[in-house]
Amino acid sequence: MYIKSIVLEGFKSYAQRTEIRDFDPLFNAITGLNGSGKSNILDSICFLLGISNLSQVRASSLQDLVYKNGQAGVNKATVSITFDNSDKKNSPLGFENNDEITITRQVIVGGRNKYLINGMNASNNRVQDLFGSVGLNVNNPHFLIMQGQITKVLNMKPTEILAMIEEAAGTRMYECKKITAHKTIEKKESKLDEIRRIITEEISPTLEKLKEARASYLEYQKMTREVENLRRIYVAFQYVRAEEIKDRSTNALKEAQANKKKIFESMAENEKKVKELAQQIEETEKKNNEEFGAKLHSLEAAFSELQRVDAKVRSDLDHRKQNLNSEENRLKELIKIMQEEFKAFTSKEKEIKKIKEGLNGLQEESKKDAEALASAQQHFNAVSAGLSSNDSGQGTSLADQMMTCKNEISKAATEAKQAQMKLKYAQQELKTKQAEVKKMDGSYKEDQEAFEAIRKTKEKLQDEMKKLKYEEAEQEAHLAKKKQLSSEISSLRELCESIEAKHPYLRFEYKNPEKNWNPNCVKGLVVTLITVKDISTSKALEAVAGGKLYNIVVDTEATGKKILEKGQLKHRYTIIPLSKISANSIGHEIISLAKNLIGHREVHIAISLIDYNSELQKAMEYVFGTTLVCSSMDNAKKVTFDKRIMRKTVTLQGDIFDPQGTLSGGASSHVTPILSKLKTMRDAEDELKIKTSQLEATEKELANLKNMAEKYQHLKQQWEMKSEEAELLQTKIQQSAYHKQQEDLLALKKTIAECEETLKKTEESQRKAEEEYKALENKMKNAEAERGKEIKNAQQKLNSAKKKADDSSRKMKEKQQEVEALVLELEQLKQEQASYKQQSEAAQQAIASLKEQVSALEAEAVKTRESLKNAENELSSEKGLMEERTKDIKAKSAKIEKYREQNNELQLSINALEHDINKYQQETADASSTLDKLLKEYKWIASEKELFGQADTTYDFEANNPKETGQKLQKLLTKKEKLEKSLNMRAMNLLSEAEERYNDLMKKKRMVENDKIKILATIEELDRKKNKALHIAWEKVNKDFGSIFSMLLPGAKAMLVPSKKQNILDGLEFRVGLGDIWKENLTELSGGQRSLAALSLILAILLFKPAPIYILDEVDAALDLSHTQNIGQMLHAHFKQSQFLVVSLKDGMFNNANVLYRTKFVDGISTVSRHCQLKKKQPLSEASNNKDE
């Protein structure tokens, strides 16, 4: 198949219809100036072949292919190529019967394009398959060698060169298909994995569940039959038992009514007798009152008055005693405070004394520094006046100073002599005393050792006392704290109890309805389960909740039922079960509307104003979730009657607005809201817990301190005893003769030390005076020089003395201020001490006065008790006289009491009989009702009741124990009811459908898995064939590559070798030999040699599996004329079965072509002219033949 003609219209530079006809089947060349449209002819062929990479035809979009992008009146580009298909062996698939194939491709501005094959519309894929079947795959166009293609081949990696061989061998398409197949297998595998997962996680569990459901359904049917059988037996027994109860109750009722009538008659008789006796007693009492009544009344009045006076006196006495105890406690407190204040006062005095001592020291130091300053000033003045200063700083002449030194030397010598004499006497006296002391030191040593032992024992006891770390004041502090905490706890308890006593309905009490009852099931009253965030909203929240505030919250309706039936509740309550309760709570949209209407802070949903446990959410929504709370009546009115909201609202004052038109409110109550009181009680309870824990900790501390205090007191007692012993021994030691001798010895030793010190001082004074005398002599000799030096020294001493005097003065003033401040504090303490003293004196006076009052009241109480006792005796005596007169009344009263007791007993009997009558009536009615109900509910009773209780029948109650039957029936009904909740009635049908789907899915899964195995086996077989074909292609291409290269570059050789491990599947590389030298790398060749090598490889690949058409676009651009000539000859020699279209500008190339087409650019449009060159070449051929001959 080869190109016969090309028709271009509106394509790139070919604006008008241009037909290029009579293409040579072998070698065609196209030439022309640059820009004349040579390459556009090749582009048109690529365009028709269906190229997808438009950059290869030098366009960015299909519109670029239209002449001037459709701007010159041409709005479409058409390319039509006629192919010769006379070679049926190489014909495209499906076109074996066509001698010519005309293919047209047209693109219209806007991107629309279409294909036509022999005038019929065709799809892009059909055209691609047509060309692909004859080796013209335009999207991998190895038949198309464009400008730059050679350079691209030179830069190819080994794997890319291998890809070219694969494409030539036809295995590349297989590789693409294999990759696609592997991807498809992977996708299918992931789908299979998904199917396996669905089978494992969804379908299999579903099947298991359905099987279980089927088993449950079968069991349910069996259970239903058994329940029906047991129910018949049990109902029959109930019917028989109801008839028996009815008969028995009717007979018992008649008997009870007869007994009641008899008892009523006996009671009437007793009442008659009681009336007669009461009339007799009344007459007797009337007589007695006339005789004793007035006096007895007078005595009773006097006795009552004395009782009142006695109570008042005792009350006053108790009050005075309490006041006395209070004053005495107050006095103790004052005395304790005064003692503490006195300690502080004493401590402050000691501190002032200590600071004053420091101040005195500073004052003396300041005085000395001031005197030193005056002395330094005087010395400076004297030196400045020409005098020299002595040691005292006074200005004197050198002669006077020398005289003074002589006097001091003489004085020191005299004092030394006196001290020497005194020392000698003291030393002799010391020896004598020491000899006497040795004779009497035995008993003294014993006393001294005993004293030392006691002192050590005292120190040991003191250390042990310190280790205890016990402070006597600590226990008192803890006791005071305990007392305070006890008082506070008592107050808090009273507060809580008083609130609970005033509001008993805050307590919810019930009896556990069953054993092992879980109290957590009952949450409690709503009012006790919430906490108000802001007290100011309490009244509003109470209005919102209303009666629901005292509803009981429980976990389930079953819990509520048990409490109501068996909890023995003392009041009526409404139960809120969390499992059932629901409320139409106000949505966020409504709340937002209300807030936008009157302001965000002016309205809130009631539930947002309380805190509660999250598990109570439903109950709180039921009570507080349907009402809004507004700040005022105006706001509440706006919100309630707004057509978008229309919800119930409550104001902070408790006024209620209902959207139905009702308004509740009015005068506000001054009573504190219960929620506020409840918060107060909760706060008090929290504080009570804290105080109670603190009290326990304090008591624990006191218990610990008690043991420690006992140890401390024991050690302290021992220490005091040892202190007394030590004092006695010390007194004895001090009064002994040995001690006096020791004191004399110490005095002598002191005298000897003083004398030795005096000797040292006199020697030092004498030495200094002699040195000073010598210095003065030197000064006399150097008077002028010494004077300047003395002035300088005097100035330095003056400056130093001045600085020191200033410092000491400043320190003294600071200390004075500190003393003044402490004196003021001390004065304050004195005033407080005086105040406490006055208070204690007043308290003592009050105590004395109260004691007198108590004594007086005690005396008065004794008198009133005596008067009361006398009045009581007199009253008893009078009553005794009256009682003797009333013995007859008592006897009659006893009879009345007896008759009344009889009537009470008879009344109890009547009550019991009435209870029995009601019971029998109820039993009869219940039995009748049961019989009617059973007959109505079970129609079969009427026909089968004759068999009830009969032996050897279904209703044989001896064979079938009714009690056991009832229990068994109840268990089966419970089990059946439980089973019904989870029972799937469609399980049988669903299971069949599910099993059918499961089997179908498993069958499809196995088919897919088998197909996968077959595909993988086929791929493996094709891989082997591909490798074989690839080796054949490589060998053939390698051979042709060497042959073509040798022809293009005589004397040179070339080959393709595997890049790694002699395995061509890893890639192929160039090897070029020039003469006998093989080059390892193409970089060692010249540019022309490299181009020829690349071109040789391309042509060798083309030669392996020749395509019908080859297109070469200026491949000779980088070659010289000789190489170009060789290319033309090589094409004639090697490619005799394919059509070549070559674009070239060199004569050496296109002179070898059979047909030459020349392009020109005329008036902005490309034109083509055809030139046949066979005639030119013929003479050359003939000449060649003649020459050979």
Curated annotation (Swiss-Prot):
Listed GO CC annotations: chromatin; condensed chromosome; condensin complex; cytoplasm; nucleus
One Pfam family from the record: SMC_N
Quaternary structure annotation from Swiss-Prot or TrEMBL: Forms a heterodimer with SMC4. Component of the condensin complex, which contains the SMC2 and SMC4 heterodimer, and probably some non SMC subunits that regulate the complex.
Keyword ATP-binding: yes
Organism whose genome encodes this protein: Gallus gallus
GO BP terms in the entry: cell division; mitotic chromosome condensation
Location(s) in or outside the cell: Nucleus; Cytoplasm; Chromosome
Region Disordered: start-end pairs: 782-814, 867-886
Entry binding sites for ATP: 32-39
Residue ranges with Basic and acidic residues bias: 782-792, 803-814
Name used for this protein in its record: Structural maintenance of chromosomes protein 2
Annotated family: Belongs to the SMC family. SMC2 subfamily.
Domain comment in the entry: The flexible SMC hinge domain, which separates the large intramolecular coiled coil regions, allows the heterodimerization with SMC4, forming a V-shaped heterodimer.
Coiled coil: 211-503, 674-1030
Gene Ontology molecular functions: ATP binding; ATP hydrolysis activity; chromatin binding
Keywords: ATP-binding, Cell cycle, Cell division, Chromosome, Coiled coil, Cytoplasm, DNA condensation, Mitosis, Nucleotide-binding, Nucleus
Keyword set includes Iron-sulfur: no
Role: Central component of the condensin complex, a complex required for conversion of interphase chromatin into mitotic-like condense chromosomes. The condensin complex probably introduces positive supercoils into relaxed DNA in the presence of type I topoisomerases and converts nicked DNA into positive knotted forms in the presence of type II topoisomerases.
InterPro entries hit by this protein: P-loop_NTPase, RecF/RecN/SMC_N, SMC, Smc2_ABC, SMC_hinge, SMC_hinge_sf
Highest taxon listed in the record's lineage: Eukaryota
Domain SMC hinge: 522-639
